[in-house]
Amino acid sequence: MNQTKISLPFGSWKSPISAKMLTEAGIAMSDLRTYKGSSFWRESRPAEKGRQVLMQRDAIGVIQSWTPPDWNVRTRVHEYGGNAYVLFDGGVVFSNFADQRLYWQKTPGSAPIALTPAGFQYADGFFDAANQRLVFVREDHQPSTVKEHGEEQNEIVAIAIPSDGAPLDAGQVLVTGSDFYAFPRVNRKGDQLVWVEWDH
Protein backbone atom coordinates (compact mmCIF):
# COMPACT_ATOMS: atom_id res chain seq x y z
CA MET A 1 0.00 0.00 0.00
CA ASN A 2 1.54 3.26 -1.12
CA GLN A 3 0.43 6.28 0.89
CA THR A 4 1.98 9.68 0.62
CA LYS A 5 2.15 11.62 3.84
CA ILE A 6 1.01 15.21 3.48
CA SER A 7 1.84 17.84 6.07
CA LEU A 8 -0.17 21.05 6.24
CA PRO A 9 -0.37 23.87 8.76
CA PHE A 10 -3.05 23.45 11.40
CA GLY A 11 -6.53 24.33 10.11
CA SER A 12 -5.58 24.48 6.43
CA TRP A 13 -6.58 20.96 5.39
CA LYS A 14 -9.83 20.35 3.44
CA SER A 15 -12.30 18.63 5.74
CA PRO A 16 -15.11 16.38 4.49
CA ILE A 17 -17.25 17.90 7.27
CA SER A 18 -18.94 21.13 6.20
CA ALA A 19 -20.84 23.79 8.13
CA LYS A 20 -23.94 22.82 6.13
CA MET A 21 -23.56 19.19 7.22
CA LEU A 22 -23.37 20.22 10.88
CA THR A 23 -26.39 22.53 10.78
CA GLU A 24 -28.73 20.54 8.58
CA ALA A 25 -31.51 18.74 10.41
CA GLY A 26 -31.64 14.99 10.25
CA ILE A 27 -34.30 12.42 10.94
CA ALA A 28 -34.62 11.67 14.66
CA MET A 29 -36.18 8.63 16.32
CA SER A 30 -37.93 8.47 19.71
CA ASP A 31 -40.36 6.38 21.77
CA LEU A 32 -38.93 3.04 20.67
CA ARG A 33 -40.85 -0.04 21.80
CA THR A 34 -41.60 -3.59 20.75
CA TYR A 35 -44.95 -5.29 20.36
CA LYS A 36 -45.67 -8.84 19.18
CA GLY A 37 -42.35 -9.29 17.36
CA SER A 38 -42.26 -5.85 15.73
CA SER A 39 -40.31 -2.72 16.64
CA PHE A 40 -42.08 0.65 16.63
CA TRP A 41 -40.80 4.21 16.91
CA ARG A 42 -41.72 7.82 16.22
CA GLU A 43 -39.70 9.38 13.43
CA SER A 44 -39.31 13.16 13.19
CA ARG A 45 -39.02 14.39 9.59
CA PRO A 46 -37.51 17.89 9.22
CA ALA A 47 -38.15 17.86 5.46
CA GLU A 48 -41.88 17.57 6.26
CA LYS A 49 -41.97 20.58 8.64
CA GLY A 50 -41.03 18.40 11.62
CA ARG A 51 -43.96 16.04 11.19
CA GLN A 52 -43.65 12.91 13.33
CA VAL A 53 -44.80 9.55 12.04
CA LEU A 54 -45.18 6.12 13.59
CA MET A 55 -42.85 3.57 11.99
CA GLN A 56 -42.79 -0.23 12.26
CA ARG A 57 -40.14 -2.86 11.53
CA ASP A 58 -41.72 -6.30 11.51
CA ALA A 59 -40.13 -9.64 12.43
CA ILE A 60 -38.81 -10.23 8.89
CA GLY A 61 -37.31 -6.75 8.57
CA VAL A 62 -39.95 -4.93 6.52
CA ILE A 63 -40.14 -1.25 7.52
CA GLN A 64 -43.32 0.77 6.96
CA SER A 65 -45.01 3.95 8.10
CA TRP A 66 -48.37 3.78 9.84
CA THR A 67 -49.07 7.50 9.62
CA PRO A 68 -50.92 8.84 6.56
CA PRO A 69 -49.79 12.16 4.99
CA ASP A 70 -50.98 15.30 6.84
CA TRP A 71 -51.14 13.48 10.20
CA ASN A 72 -48.61 14.15 12.97
CA VAL A 73 -48.10 11.75 15.91
CA ARG A 74 -47.28 14.25 18.63
CA THR A 75 -48.78 15.65 21.84
CA ARG A 76 -48.63 18.99 23.68
CA VAL A 77 -49.38 17.65 27.18
CA HIS A 78 -47.40 19.62 29.82
CA GLU A 79 -46.19 21.78 26.89
CA TYR A 80 -43.22 19.41 26.41
CA GLY A 81 -45.19 16.61 24.80
CA GLY A 82 -44.53 13.01 25.70
CA ASN A 83 -45.36 9.55 24.51
CA ALA A 84 -47.94 10.09 21.78
CA TYR A 85 -48.99 6.54 20.85
CA VAL A 86 -50.04 3.23 22.37
CA LEU A 87 -50.15 -0.19 20.73
CA PHE A 88 -52.77 -2.84 21.41
CA ASP A 89 -54.25 -5.87 19.64
CA GLY A 90 -56.61 -3.69 17.58
CA GLY A 91 -53.90 -1.45 16.13
CA VAL A 92 -52.57 1.87 17.41
CA VAL A 93 -54.10 4.85 19.20
CA PHE A 94 -52.22 8.13 18.79
CA SER A 95 -52.46 11.83 19.58
CA ASN A 96 -52.68 14.02 16.47
CA PHE A 97 -50.71 17.26 16.83
CA ALA A 98 -53.15 19.49 14.91
CA ASP A 99 -56.13 18.98 17.23
CA GLN A 100 -54.66 16.91 20.12
CA ARG A 101 -57.47 14.37 19.87
CA LEU A 102 -56.86 10.62 20.05
CA TYR A 103 -57.27 8.60 16.86
CA TRP A 104 -57.36 4.87 16.20
CA GLN A 105 -55.70 3.17 13.25
CA LYS A 106 -56.37 -0.51 12.62
CA THR A 107 -53.56 -1.07 10.11
CA PRO A 108 -50.60 0.84 8.63
CA GLY A 109 -51.79 3.66 6.39
CA SER A 110 -55.49 3.16 7.21
CA ALA A 111 -57.70 6.19 7.78
CA PRO A 112 -57.52 7.32 11.43
CA ILE A 113 -60.83 7.21 13.34
CA ALA A 114 -61.50 9.89 15.99
CA LEU A 115 -61.90 8.49 19.52
CA THR A 116 -62.06 11.59 21.70
CA PRO A 117 -63.86 14.94 21.52
CA ALA A 118 -62.10 18.29 21.17
CA GLY A 119 -60.93 20.18 24.25
CA PHE A 120 -58.60 17.52 25.68
CA GLN A 121 -54.96 16.53 25.17
CA TYR A 122 -53.53 13.07 25.84
CA ALA A 123 -50.10 11.53 26.48
CA ASP A 124 -48.32 8.53 28.00
CA GLY A 125 -50.88 5.97 26.89
CA PHE A 126 -50.77 2.41 28.22
CA PHE A 127 -52.72 -0.69 27.18
CA ASP A 128 -54.26 -2.23 30.32
CA ALA A 129 -54.74 -5.78 28.99
CA ALA A 130 -56.29 -7.14 32.20
CA ASN A 131 -59.12 -4.59 32.12
CA GLN A 132 -59.22 -4.23 28.32
CA ARG A 133 -58.86 -0.45 28.35
CA LEU A 134 -56.37 2.30 27.54
CA VAL A 135 -54.97 4.51 30.31
CA PHE A 136 -53.73 8.04 29.52
CA VAL A 137 -52.60 11.28 31.10
CA ARG A 138 -55.22 13.81 30.04
CA GLU A 139 -55.18 17.60 30.10
CA ASP A 140 -58.66 19.10 30.19
CA HIS A 141 -58.57 22.32 28.15
CA GLN A 142 -62.32 22.84 27.95
CA PRO A 143 -63.24 26.53 28.43
CA SER A 144 -65.53 25.65 31.37
CA THR A 145 -62.67 23.83 33.15
CA VAL A 146 -60.17 26.64 32.57
CA LYS A 147 -62.74 29.21 33.77
CA GLU A 148 -63.48 27.23 36.95
CA HIS A 149 -59.85 26.41 37.87
CA GLY A 150 -57.93 29.23 36.20
CA GLU A 151 -55.94 26.74 34.10
CA GLU A 152 -56.25 23.37 32.44
CA GLN A 153 -56.58 20.32 34.70
CA ASN A 154 -54.41 17.19 34.51
CA GLU A 155 -55.81 13.75 35.27
CA ILE A 156 -55.26 10.08 34.61
CA VAL A 157 -58.15 8.57 32.66
CA ALA A 158 -59.30 5.23 31.28
CA ILE A 159 -60.66 5.03 27.74
CA ALA A 160 -62.56 2.06 26.36
CA ILE A 161 -60.86 -0.10 23.74
CA PRO A 162 -61.96 1.38 20.40
CA SER A 163 -64.58 -0.35 18.32
CA ASP A 164 -66.34 0.52 15.08
CA GLY A 165 -69.18 2.99 15.57
CA ALA A 166 -68.41 3.72 19.23
CA PRO A 167 -69.26 7.24 20.45
CA LEU A 168 -66.50 9.75 21.25
CA ASP A 169 -65.10 9.10 24.74
CA ALA A 170 -63.16 11.73 26.71
CA GLY A 171 -62.29 9.09 29.33
CA GLN A 172 -63.28 8.05 32.85
CA VAL A 173 -61.22 9.88 35.49
CA LEU A 174 -59.11 7.51 37.61
CA VAL A 175 -56.81 10.01 39.37
CA THR A 176 -57.07 13.79 39.83
CA GLY A 177 -55.90 16.50 42.23
CA SER A 178 -52.25 17.11 41.32
CA ASP A 179 -50.86 19.62 38.84
CA PHE A 180 -49.02 17.10 36.66
CA TYR A 181 -49.07 13.36 35.97
CA ALA A 182 -46.82 11.08 33.94
CA PHE A 183 -46.25 7.41 33.11
CA PRO A 184 -49.42 5.71 34.38
CA ARG A 185 -48.99 1.93 34.35
CA VAL A 186 -51.21 -0.96 35.44
CA ASN A 187 -49.86 -4.26 36.77
CA ARG A 188 -50.56 -7.53 34.91
CA LYS A 189 -53.41 -8.50 37.23
CA GLY A 190 -55.06 -5.14 36.53
CA ASP A 191 -55.63 -4.30 40.19
CA GLN A 192 -52.90 -1.70 40.80
CA LEU A 193 -52.19 1.59 39.04
CA VAL A 194 -48.90 3.47 39.51
CA TRP A 195 -47.86 6.89 38.20
CA VAL A 196 -45.58 9.87 38.76
CA GLU A 197 -47.16 13.13 39.95
CA TRP A 198 -45.91 16.57 40.96
CA ASP A 199 -47.25 20.03 41.76
CA HIS A 200 -46.21 23.62 40.95
Spell out what each predicted region is.
Residues 1-53:
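Sequence/structural signature of beta-propeller modules
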Residues 3-5, 10, 62-65, 101, ...:
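Predominantly a core beta-strand signature of beta-propeller blades
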Residues 15-23, 64-75, 111-116, 170-175:
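A short beta-strand motif characteristic of beta-propeller blades
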Residues 25-38, 72-92, 119-134, 176-194:
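Conserved beta-propeller blade repeats
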Residues 35, 50, 59, 88-89, ...:
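Short loop/turn segments that connect beta-strands within the blades of beta-propeller domains
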Residues 43-53, 73-79, 94-102, 117-123, ...:
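A flexible loop/linker signature enriched in serine peptidases of the S9 family
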Residues 44, 57-59, 105-107, 161:
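Inter-blade boundary loops/turns of WD-repeat beta-propellers
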Residues 55-58, 153-163:
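Beta-propeller blade signature
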